[in-house]
């Protein structure tokens, strides 16, 4: 899904990761969105990942600023820990 909100242009995907695969799924998903945004003609500012865990729990929503995330996913000048600390926001809804 692609949308604009306020001053943001967002790329969003929704996934249903296994309980044991949450971290790998999170990193893989944000890497894919970062790579797509990097080659896109549209200037995306943020990526959003919505993770669903069955019918009984509320989804977890993670968001990253794409410019900030480039250091980890595109340029490989930062590590995952730096990306999580500086660029990633996770909320349960």
Model-identified regions with their sequence ranges:
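Polar/charged, Gly/Pro-rich intrinsically disordered segments
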Residues: 1-17, 41-93
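Short, non-transmembrane amphipathic alpha-helical segments
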Residues: 22-44
């Amino acid at each position: 899904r692609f949308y604009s909100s306020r001053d943001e242009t967002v790329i969003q995907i929704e996934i249903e990761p296994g309980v044991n695969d949450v971290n790998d799924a999170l990193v893989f998903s944000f890497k894919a969105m970062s790579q797509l945004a990097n080659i896109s003609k549209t200037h995306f500012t943020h990526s959003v990942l919505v993770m669903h865990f069955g019918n009984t729990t509320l989804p977890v929503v993670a968001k990253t600023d794409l410019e900030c995330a480039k250091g980890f996913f595109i340029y490989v000048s930062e590590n995952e820990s730096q990306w999580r600390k500086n660029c990633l926001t996770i909320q349960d809804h």
